[in-house]
Amino acid sequence: MGRYVIRRLLQMIPVFFGATLLIFLMVNVMGDPIAGLCGDRQCDPATAAQLEKEFGLDKPVWQQYLTYMGNVFTGDFGTAFNGQEVTELMANAFPVTIRLTLVAIFFEIVIGISLGVLTGLKRGHPVDTTVLLLTLVVIAIPTFVTGLLLQLLLGVKWGWIKPAVSTDAPLDELIVPGLVLASVSLAYVTRLTRTSIAENKRADYVRTAVAKGLPRHRVITRHLLRNSLIPVVTFIGTDVGALMGGAIVTERIFNIHGVGYQLYQGILRQNTQTVVGFVTVLVLVFLVANLLVDLLYAVLDPRIRYA
């Protein structure tokens, strides 16, 4: 296991550099960030030259990237164009988005897997058909429509929640935004769990467990569910980074000042330091999540061993 982890960590190094280089190049072709600072009016040439020198934009792109990566390994993600350190923005934004993501993952696991097990065991029954139709409707509706609808009904019309989340984003105010963020993924987890349960319940090891006279709940939890969760864990593991980076719409609707909000502001203002810095951390989240998912396979299925 130790050798496998070391090998995976070494494989993550070129992936990390390749992903950050790609993001760095994409952000640099968005436009001239100095022109974005000046707004509608044209920048004074002397002022523009001074700003380019201050932020290192007067150097070739490859040199900017090497300088940036060198600073990253010392914990310096640069300075935003408003003079604020990017690490300071991260310290304020990431805790909020992490809480929002944890709420979303909770809904995915509890509701998604529960409905998937229920429909997988009752495949072909009316409850199975109903849940499948509901998940299809959820997948078909865009996230911003779901968010605006719940905000209007629960927050504005009925007054059950605050229409906008407070600045400190307490956990109780993130329940509805977390449900909105998790809605589409929850539907996919339900359908994925259902398919996996329906296929594995006909497997030989399940029939053997039933033939031995094991209680039904033990057959489901210890044998059927454990082996059926492997594709679900894969989806949820990769979805962690997607939820953190894809929360832009949800955070905009509920006025949550998290990672999505900072990315939106960075892209809108062509603030390359902010965008590249936040995406660099999200790349690390993706890589670590994938590694943890691979290690979790061996826990769920004892037949899987890593040399």
Where are these regions (language model features)?
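Membrane-interfacial helix-loop-helix junctions in multi-pass membrane proteins
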Residues: 52-62, 76-83, 87, 163-171, ...
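Membrane-water interface segments at the C-terminal ends of transmembrane alpha-helices
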Residues: 22-30, 56, 70, 133-162, ...
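An internal, D/E-rich "acidic patch" concept
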Residues: 57-113
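Small-residue-rich alpha-helical segments with characteristic i,i+4
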Residues: 15, 122-137, 141-143
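Residue-level recognition of pore/gate-forming positions within transmembrane alpha-helices
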Residues: 12, 20, 43, 109, ...
